[in-house]
């Protein structure tokens, strides 16, 4: 006979999750593997001759790249000789300024910085993250996708997402050739919701770069780097080729960051027996060495791997902290779904939500998860109210805000009509009034009429083949009567010329003002310092629609 309590527990959502015991030899260990190298560095005549116990004769491509470009050698020997526990204390001590820490962390080797953060528990890591994030003001990023690649729905959802507070929005495709329509719809909708929101379309790298050069996206993120050489070469890549791609984006005025995440090497079968965090540290150093301003990390689409082993979610926070400690923008994941448990996914979110990161999620699904083409997110559109209440409960700025239904309906309708004008002006397959009406009130693709997919794909490919650029979109908006949106779209193109939003951790706010680590420096130094939720922003977060006004109660 079974215990009734254990029968009840067996039915709990968390017991549908996958867990595995540590398997050190294959890399199924989140942190502190006995196979991780001991920190070391030797420098002869300004060149690294030993890195983390490995002589230069045994360096792989990643070692060479990091040794040449990724470490501040001027202070490396000094910092490597410092006690790691002392360095860990300095990281989480608010009395030690970020400006004092960065010269130390950027002079460490990957094994050294992993050793440092391994001395910290999650509360200490959150204390450190609050101080070490690059931009003073935390922010949020959204996923905006649907299973039908319906551009009208993407535009409406993007407008709502921007209205709710997302500063970056990302789409991808179910069908690769739909990409130009998705990119245009996302950018148009985002500018309707709030001018200045940055957008991207995650694709195969050549197409993604092409769309950026045509002016249909504002940034790129899914340029992946890995912590072992076989995973790199399996994808016909090297750290140098990724660095070249990064410079291609930057030279066109497009913001970009790399992507990596613990567990990717295990998933690809090339972990070389090292811990997930150590291999991820190598990815972060590759990013720094390539001169890229930021990184999306936090396991991202590999979250099922670290979350299955002990201390895995702690390791995810640790990799975010290492990223910020190397003075990089950190888009800290809270991305792909990994658990059936609401309690567990909230605990995972709080690691980044409470201290704040440059982008707490990368991204939060602004659509219901059944429409999320990034395989679902840790938070989706059905969590908006919960998220806003948690911000209010804890007085934490998580990047979003409460909204009114009538405002959302209006903004969705305007976005759908604006895209209708773009398609008409550019001679693309027409968007019907029925589609506009459906997108105005839709929750997801189940609420949308079908489009002629064959026609859409044909014309979408013409965008690429005929080099139809963002200025054509601006012209179509102006001719269609949406002069305000046309101006906002033009301003986004101008931003690529000025280049201000290429600075570390940049977002565009207000009337085109760029906030970045340059002019919004994180000055946290303990209580009453750094970013504080106050004034109009706190009033906005407090004012949730469900709150009763005592003055209006009879």
Swiss-Prot record:
Induction: BMC production is induced by growth on 1,2-PD vitamin B12 medium. By either propanediol or glycerol. Pathway: Polyol metabolism; 1,2-propanediol degradation. The keyword Cell division does not apply. The propanediol dehydratase enzyme is a heterotrimeric complex composed of a large (PduC), a medium (PduD) and a small (PduE) subunit. GO terms for cellular component: propanediol degradation polyhedral organelle. Keywords: Bacterial microcompartment, Cobalamin, Cobalt, Lyase. The gene is pduC. It comes from Salmonella typhimurium (strain LT2 / SGSC1412 / ATCC 700720). GO terms for molecular function: cobalamin binding; propanediol dehydratase activity. This is Propanediol dehydratase large subunit. Its cofactor is adenosylcob(III)alamin. Disruption phenotype: Cells lacking this gene are defective in aerobic degradation of propanediol and display no propanediol dehydratase activity. A triple pduC-pduD-pduE deletion releases no acetaldehyde when grown on propanediol. Signal peptide: none annotated. It is found in: Bacterial microcompartment. Part of the PduCDE complex that catalyzes the dehydration of 1,2-propanediol (1,2-PD) to propionaldehyde. Required for S.typhimurium growth on 1,2-PD as the sole carbon and energy source. This subunit is directly targeted to the BMC. The 1,2-PD-specific bacterial microcompartment (BMC) concentrates low levels of 1,2-PD catabolic enzymes, concentrates volatile reaction intermediates thus enhancing pathway flux and keeps the level of toxic, mutagenic propionaldehyde low. InterPro entries: Cbl-dep_enz_cat, Diol/glycerol_deHase_lsu_sf, Diol/glycerol_deHydtase_lsu. Its main location: other. It is an enzyme of class 4 (lyase).
């Amino acid at each position: 006979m079974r215990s009734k309590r254990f029968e009840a527990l067996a039915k709990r959502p968390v017991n549908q999750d996958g867990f595995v015991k540590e398997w050190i030899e294959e890399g199924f260990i989140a942190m502190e593997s006995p196979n991780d190298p001991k920190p070391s560095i030797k420098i002869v005549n300004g060149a690294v001759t030993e890195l983390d116990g490995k002589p230069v004769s045994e360096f792989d491509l990643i070692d060479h790249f990091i040794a040449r470009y990724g470490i501040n050698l001027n202070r490396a020997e000094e910092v490597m000789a410092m006690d790691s526990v002392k360095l860990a204390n300095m990281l989480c001590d608010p009395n030690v300024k970020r400006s004092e820490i960065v010269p130390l962390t950027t002079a460490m080797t990957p094994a050294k910085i992993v050793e440092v953060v391994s001395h910290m528990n999650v509360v200490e890591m959150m204390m450190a993250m609050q101080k070490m994030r690059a931009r003073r003001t935390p922010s949020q990023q959204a996923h905006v996708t649907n299973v039908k690649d319906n551009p009208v729905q993407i535009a409406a959802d993007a407008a709502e997402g921007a209205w709710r507070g997302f500063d970056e929005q990302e789409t991808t495709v179910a069908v690769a050739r739909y990409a130009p329509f998705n990119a245009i719809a996302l950018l148009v909708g985002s500018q309707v919701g709030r001018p200045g929101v940055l957008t991207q379309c995650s694709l195969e790298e050549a197409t993604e770069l092409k769309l950026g050069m045509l002016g249909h996206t504002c940034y790129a993120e899914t340029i992946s780097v890995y912590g072992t050489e076989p995973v790199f070469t399996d994808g016909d890549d090297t750290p140098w080729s990724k660095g070249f791609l990064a410079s291609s984006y930057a030279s066109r005025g497009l913001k970009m960051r790399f992507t990596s995440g613990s567990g990717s090497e295990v998933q690809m079968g090339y972990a070389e027996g090292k811990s997930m965090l150590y291999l991820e540290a190598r990815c972060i150093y590759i990013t720094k060495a390539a001169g890229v301003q930021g990184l999306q990390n936090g396991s991202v689409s590999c979250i099922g791997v670290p979350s299955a082993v002990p201390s895995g979610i702690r390791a995810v926070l640790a990799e975010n902290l290492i990223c910020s400690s190397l003075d990089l923008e950190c888009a800290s994941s809270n991305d792909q779904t990994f658990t059936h448990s609401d309690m567990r996914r909230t605990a995972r979110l709080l690691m980044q939500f409470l201290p704040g990161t440059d982008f707490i999620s990368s991204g939060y699904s602004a659509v219901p998860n059944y429409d999320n083409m990034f395989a679902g997110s840790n938070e989706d559109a059905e969590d908006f109210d919960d998220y806003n209440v948690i911000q209010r409960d804890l007085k934490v700025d998580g990047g979003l805000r409460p909204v009114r239904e009538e405002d959302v309906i209006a903004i969705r309708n305007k976005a759908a009509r604006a895209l209708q004008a773009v398609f008409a002006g550019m001679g693309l397959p027409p968007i019907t009034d029925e589609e506009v009406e459906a997108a105005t009130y839709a929750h997801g693709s189940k609420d949308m009429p079908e489009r002629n997919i064959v026609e859409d794909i044909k014309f979408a490919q013409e965008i690429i083949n005929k080099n139809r650029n963002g200025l054509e979109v601006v012209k179509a908006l102006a001719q269609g009567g949406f002069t305000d949106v046309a101006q906002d779209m033009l301003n986004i193109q101008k931003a690529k010329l000025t280049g201000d939003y290429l600075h570390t951790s940049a977002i565009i706010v207000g009337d085109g003002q760029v906030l970045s680590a340059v002019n919004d420096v994180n000055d946290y130094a303990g209580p009453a310092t750094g970013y504080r939720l106050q004034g109009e922003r706190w009033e906005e977060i407090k004012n949730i629609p469900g709150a009763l006004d005592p003055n209006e109660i009879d």
